[in-house]
Every structure is written in C-alpha cells, then in structure tokens.
C-alpha cells in the first residue's frame, strides 16, 4: 500500500482482505470467490472491469515489459462516496516499453504480432500469470477489451495515423501535426 501514509490497523486489515478477495476471484477459474462471511462475489465486485481493460490495452499496445508486474498501480474508491472498487490507474513507468526492450522469456518485443501483457508471467515461464495476464483469461474482462479496442483504441489509432477523420479528440493530434 502506497498511501495514505498514516492508516489504522483496521484500515490495513480491511484493504488487505479486500485485495486478497480480489486476487482470489482473479485467480479462480470462474472469476468468483467466497469471502470470510461466506458470501460469493465476482471479480467485478472488487475491481472496475473497464479501467482494467483500458490498462490492459495500453500495456499490450506499448509492449510494456513491466505490465502487471512492477510499476502497476491500483487505487480504491471510497465505499461511502465512490463505487468501492479498485481501479487500474494511473499509468506509470514505460522505460521498458515501446521498443526499449527486445526480448524476455522467449517473447520478441520487436515482433508486432506477439502478445505480451496477455501471456506475461510473474517471474519466469514456470510461474503464474501476473495480474494483467490473469485478468484477460476471464471472459468478462476479455470481452470489455475487445469492445474498447473496436470503439475507442482503433478509431484513435486510425486518427493518429491520418487514416480517419472520424475521431473527435481535442488532445490527440495526427502524425501530420508534428
């Protein structure tokens, strides 16, 4: 836990149990877990699926070696004033992304047809999937990834490349603008 700096033991216990329940659902085959009260909960009860899908797309598109392993942040909305879920954000640390690293565990980062975030393991090829790779093993997350790829990422990419004028962004410029 990065912040806040000063927290009570009860708060640490609460967030630890919450995160553990999220991981239990994440690493389960069906995306569900049973909490300490005996109640069954879905992965989507613990983490915002859309923010997770957006983070996945950004990590995969950039072929970020750190995807879901290090420099991967989540924040939790308040149970009282927010949705009470974890959210994947902010994006951070792309020093070994976008071609700054050539290979790891047999994955060639210079090959644009390779998956990385989808198959990334914690330490080596024999360890379990990291958070990002495990998330997209669940149909709910993978379907959201596909939806966002078609509805937002591809239109933005086509706009940047000058292949489409249909994208209406104020902060994104085409390559011709540079």
Residues of each region from the PLM?
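Intrinsically disordered or highly flexible coil/loop and linker segments, enriched in small
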Residues: 28-32, 62-67, 141, 154-159
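Active-site acidic catalytic loop and adjacent metal/ATP-binding pocket
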Residues: 45-101
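C-terminal catalytic region of ATP-dependent kinase domains
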Residues: 2-12, 16-19, 23, 36, ...
């Amino acid at each position: 836990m990065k912040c806040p700096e000063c927290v009570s033991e009860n708060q640490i216990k609460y967030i630890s149990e919450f995160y553990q329940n999220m991981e239990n659902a994440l690493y389960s085959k069906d995306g569900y877990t049973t909490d300490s009260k005996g109640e069954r909960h879905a992965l989507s009860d613990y983490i915002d699926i859309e923010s997770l899908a957006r983070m996945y797309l950004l990590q995969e598109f950039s072929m970020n070696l750190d995807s879901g392993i290090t420099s991967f942040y989540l924040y939790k909305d308040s149970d009282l004033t927010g949705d009470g879920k974890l959210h994947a954000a902010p994006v951070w640390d792309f020093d070994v992304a976008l071609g700054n690293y050539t290979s790891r565990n047999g994955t060639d980062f210079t090959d644009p047809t390779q998956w990385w975030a989808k198959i990334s393991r914690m330490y080596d090829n024999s360890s379990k999937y990291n958070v990002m790779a495990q998330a997209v093993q669940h149909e709910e997350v993978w379907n959201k990834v596909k939806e966002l790829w078609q509805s937002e990422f591809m239109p933005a990419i086509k706009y940047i490349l000058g292949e489409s004028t249909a994208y209406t962004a104020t902060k994104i410029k085409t390559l011709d603008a540079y």
